[in-house]
Amino acid sequence: MKRSDFMLAGQQDRERYIVRPEKQIPLTMLVPGSESHLVSTKEFTVSFLTMKAGSVFDVHSHPQSQCMIVLEGKCDEIIDGKIYSVSAGDVLYLPANVPHGAFIEEDCRVIDVFCPCREDYMQKFVEQHPDSVTYFRTV
């Protein structure tokens, strides 16, 4: 395989496959003190989440599997009735339907990946940004 065997993608091609969430997608409030840039298809949702110290995610469950990558900060995750302290560099896996929640100890940035997509998050996006584009929904 050689680079010269391929054409350089144009801007229209790029827009079909690539998005810069922090520049192109408005923040959606998930819970008070926690906002996210959401990228979604039918197969997955990626949440670029910023959580303020003192934020709380009540214990809940959902039918999606979840992988959380902690980029900055620290939080206490409640998983199946136990508290797990996680911080920058940790990767957390939550199988579908496992009860979980979180206490945000200090400002924290994470990337959450959900499979399949979080329709409830996309509904929040649409409610908060009715005139915005929902990236990748038709890819």
For every predicted segment, state its role.
Residues 1-43, 127-139:
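A short, N-terminal "cap"/entry segment at the start of jelly-roll beta-barrel domains
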Residues 32, 46-61:
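Conserved short histidine dyad/triad with adjacent acidic residue
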Residues 50-52, 61-77, 113-116:
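Short, conserved beta-strand element in jelly-roll/cupin
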Residues 63, 79, 111-112, 117-125, ...:
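Anionic, Ser/Thr-rich low-complexity intrinsically disordered regions
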Residues 71-72, 87-88, 106:
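A cytosolic small-molecule/anion-sensing beta-strand core signal
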Residues 81-96:
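Short acidic-glycine-tyrosine-enriched beta hairpin
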Residues 96-120:
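Ligand-binding loop in jelly-roll beta-barrel domains
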